[in-house]
Amino acid sequence: MESKSDASVATTPIISSSSSPPPSLSPRVVLSPCAACKILRRRCAERCVLAPYFPPTDPAKFTIAHRVFGASNIIKFLQELPESQRTDAVNSMVYEAEARIRDPVYGCAGAIYHLQRQVSELQAQLAKAQVEMVNMQFQRSNLLELIYNMDQQQKQEQDNMSFESNDLGFLEDKSNTNSSMLWWDPLWTC
């Protein structure tokens, strides 16, 4: 009985009335077990491999990974990796476990397949839209060229009409063509 009271005294910080800072606690005092240890109903050790990646506030994260991979496999996998890669590995395991629960046959490969198929469909739609855009640009340029040609033809017809109706009628005598030729003769016979 004495050992239990000693253990509780050792983990409880002593508060003194002096202005000195409280004594420092050991490097990682576990106040609440990590989600993994809580779900596995075991004591969370000070150097628990799972504690940094499965906080007590998110037990569903460990539950999903544990359901697919198993706790011993997760621990073994994390111990083989350097600490810098463990966070990404845990996130990947949780993602793969969620995908496996959603699609037990294909897992994350099924999700990847669906995403690749969606990308292919979107690329086909994009190519079709680009072809339609090129066709519309071609039609627009043809229409502009047609409008320009019609406008030029209309201007030319107007110019021809105005030239024909010009006031040069005083030079020719429509009633007598011989008399008009006589009028011009003196200019060339000089």
Swiss-Prot record:
Listed Polar residues bias regions: 1-11
Pfam families: LOB (PF03195)
Organism domain of life: Eukaryota
Annotated stretches, region: Disordered: 1-27
One GO CC term on file: mitochondrion
Stretches assigned to the LOB domain: 32-133
Tissue spec: Expressed in young shoots, roots, stems, leaves and flowers.
InterPro entries: LOB
Coiled coil: none
Record-stated family: Belongs to the LOB domain-containing protein family.
Name assigned to this protein: LOB domain-containing protein 1
Organism: Arabidopsis thaliana
Taxonomic path: Eukaryota, Viridiplantae, Streptophyta, Embryophyta, Tracheophyta
